[in-house]
Structures are given as structure tokens and as C-alpha cells.
């Protein structure tokens, strides 16, 4: 089975659709249901206690885990001077803590099944961007966690991928900024194209591990 966090919207939703079409059992972990999921485990990933319950629900399904894709995330666009402690907790809990705790709670089954792990970071986790200090810090942290996972699982059959796409069109950016325009004038990538790229990485032979991939928007004119 394919476990996807945050499959109710955006990239997670497109991934769920692709895997459903491929005949895989899809398990969504998020606050809202995913129409493509075979199992919806509705939990708030900001809360550690709910993540533990979600992990137990996954294990109770009794099926091998093929991949865990940590896709759930929230965006923060706030200038320095206006960042609050609550905002830091909101972003770090969803973007970093949730992935760490979910993997930690499932690690024995992950090793047993040789399950792959994909942590969806961002190009914001590779360089600094104006007004994205908290979001950027969360994505840098997620990349750090991924690097540690790669070391800890290097002698297993589990592949660990840091997936770092640039901006693609979802409701996430529009909700945070009130618009859907790119700052540099390039066109947004499509979530379905980004999802296909991620799936293709996991479709590679098991002895091929793409440790990190960066996908940038490219001007077409």
C-alpha cells in the first residue's frame, strides 16, 4: 500500500489519483478525506498524539507498506518582524514534526517491508527567499531529517528520497498570499506533472535510489 500524508488536496491528491489508477491501495492521512483513497485516516498531523493513533491505524490494516510519502505541508509568507511563535509552531508541527513522528512510529514496519520514504521538501529548502523564513526553515529541517534517514537506512532495502520541487499551482500559495502569480514571471508547474515525476522516481528499479531531486520552474519563452 501507498501511504500519503495530505492527500486531500494539491500534490498529495494528484499522487493519490496516479496510484489509484495504477491499481495500488492508497491510504490518506490528513484532516480531510481524499476521494481517491481506499482508506482515509482522518487525523490532525500537527498533534503528536494523533500521529501515533494514525500510525497504529496503518499497522492495523495488516498490509505491506510499499511507500510512505510525507506530502502534508503548510505555507507561511510572513516578513521578519511579524512572525509569531504560534506561526512557527503551526508550520514546524505540520512540515517537520509530523514526518519525523510518523516515520518513527512506523520504522519497524518500514524496515520489515523495505518501504520507500519520500519527504516532499522544496527549492525553498535549498536557498533563502524573502518573507519565507519560517517556511524555508521547515523545509531545510525536513531535508536534514531526510539525510539522517538515508544514513540510518543505508543497509536496508528502503530508499529515501528528498523531493524538492519549485513552485507549482495549488491552492496552498493562493491561500497564503491572496494571489496565484509567480514572482519571477515564469509559469507555475502543474501539480499533476510534479506528481508524475515523483511517482516515476519510485518506479525505478529498487537498486536505484535518487537521494535528492530538485525541480525548477523553467521559462518557456
What are these regions (language model features)?
Residues 8, 16:
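N-terminal Rossmann NAD(P)H-binding glycine-rich loop of SDR-like oxidoreductase domains
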Residues 71-76:
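Conserved NAD(P)H cofactor-binding loop of Rossmann-fold oxidoreductase domains
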Residues 79-80, 87-89:
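Substrate-binding pocket helix/loop in short-chain dehydrogenase/reductase
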Residues 81, 129-133, 186:
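Active-site loop immediately N-terminal to the catalytic Tyr-X3-Lys motif
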Residues 103, 138:
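Active-site helix of classical SDR
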Residues 122:
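Residue(s) in the substrate-gating loop at a strand-loop-helix junction
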Residues 162, 182-221:
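C-terminal helical subdomain
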Amino acid at each position: 500500500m501507498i501511504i500519503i500524508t495530505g492527500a486531500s488536496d494539491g500534490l498529495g491528491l494528484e499522487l493519490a489519483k496516479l496510484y489509484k489508477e495504477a491499481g495500488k491501495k492508497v491510504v490518506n492521512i490528513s484532516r480531510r478525506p481524499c476521494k481517491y483513497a481506499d482508506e482515509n485516516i482522518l487525523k490532525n498531523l500537527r498533534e503528536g498524539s494523533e500521529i501515533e493513533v494514525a500510525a497504529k491505524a496503518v499497522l492495523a490494516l495488516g498490509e505491506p507498506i510499499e511507500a510512505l510519502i510525507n506530502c502534508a505541508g503548510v505555507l507561511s509568507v510572513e516578513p521578519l518582524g511579524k512572525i509569531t511563535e504560534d506561526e512557527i509552531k503551526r508550520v514546524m508541527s505540520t512540515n517537520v514534526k509530523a514526518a519525523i513522528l510518523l516515520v518513527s512510529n512506523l520504522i519497524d514496519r518500514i524496515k520489515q517491508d523495505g518501504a520507500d520514504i519520500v519527504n516532499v521538501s522544496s527549492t525553498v529548502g535549498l536557498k533563502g527567499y524573502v518573507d519565507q523564513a519560517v517556511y524555508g526553515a521547515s523545509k531545510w529541517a525536513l531535508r536534514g531529517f531526510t539525510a539522517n534517514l538515508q544514513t540510518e537506512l543505508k543497509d536496508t532495502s528502503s530508499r529515501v528520497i528528498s523531493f524538492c520541487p519549485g513552485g507549482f499551482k495549488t491552492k496552498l500559495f493562493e491561500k497564503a498570499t491572496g494571489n496565484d502569480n509567480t514572482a519571477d514571471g515564469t509559469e507555475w508547474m502543474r501539480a499533476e506533472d510534479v506528481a508524475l515525476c515523483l511517482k516515476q522516481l519510485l518506479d525505478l528499479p529498487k537498486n536505484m535510489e535518487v537521494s535528492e531531486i530538485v525541480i525548477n520552474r523553467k521559462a518557456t519563452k
